[in-house]
């Protein structure tokens, strides 16, 4: 964010959310739920969208996290420690046509059937065929017409692109856009681990950009 083409303004009370996609390894699955490995801790009781690749199409099912534990620590490409979590999730919306597609997915990729007290589970072979949508919240600290500086718990890799939104006032309409990560640094605030992240607005329609411009004009006076 070195070449600033637009004036930047500090803001208070502006919060937003983004959706991060994580590829997951499916360990086993049943009609009622799934066990996965994922690169981040999931909140027990939280509901997430799981995108399953079925041949040339994707179905999305929603699932509730029942348990989540740290499974192992792997080494990243640069030798950094990368935690891997195991989680159990219960499907919440399978009473629909998605149920038959899910049954087909299980049957297509199963390796071993495993009979448990809670019902039949199968181990499946489907590498790279499932993505988990993980919602994250953030606080906007500084904003301009071209981007913003936000604060959130998790750090993000540079050049990552993700769908984002924020509301300029409580109860107001959300401004939705695609953001690209251009800066990320860890900041310690009263022993709380947070990250300051620079985001460039990559894809925002003209009407929403006008709302943003009007807001910036109102706080610049």
Where are these regions (language model features)?
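Structured alpha-helical
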Residues: 1-221
């Amino acid at each position: 964010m070195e070449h600033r083409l637009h004036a930047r303004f500090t803001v208070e009370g502006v919060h937003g959310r983004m959706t991060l996609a994580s590829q997951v390894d499916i360990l086993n699955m049943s009609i009622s739920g799934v066990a996965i490995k994922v690169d981040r801790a999931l909140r027990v009781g939280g509901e997430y969208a799981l995108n399953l690749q079925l041949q040339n199409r994707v179905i999305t099912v929603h699932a509730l996290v029942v348990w989540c534990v740290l499974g192992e620590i792997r080494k990243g490409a640069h030798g950094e420690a990368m935690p891997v979590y195991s989680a159990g999730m219960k499907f919440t919306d399978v009473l629909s046509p998605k149920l038959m597609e899910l049954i087909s997915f299980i049957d297509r990729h199963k390796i071993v059937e495993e009979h448990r007290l809670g019902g039949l589970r199968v181990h499946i072979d489907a590498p790279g065929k499932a993505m988990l949508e993980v919602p994250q919240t953030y606080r906007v600290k500084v904003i301009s017409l071209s981007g913003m500086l936000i604060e959130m718990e998790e750090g993000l890799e540079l050049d990552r692109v993700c769908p984002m939104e924020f509301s300029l006032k409580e109860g107001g309409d959300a401004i939705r856009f695609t953001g690209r990560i251009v800066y990320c640094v860890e900041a310690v605030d009263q022993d709380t681990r947070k990250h300051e992240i620079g985001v460039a607005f990559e894809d925002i329609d003209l009407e929403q950009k006008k709302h943003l411009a009007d807001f910036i004009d109102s706080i610049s006076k």
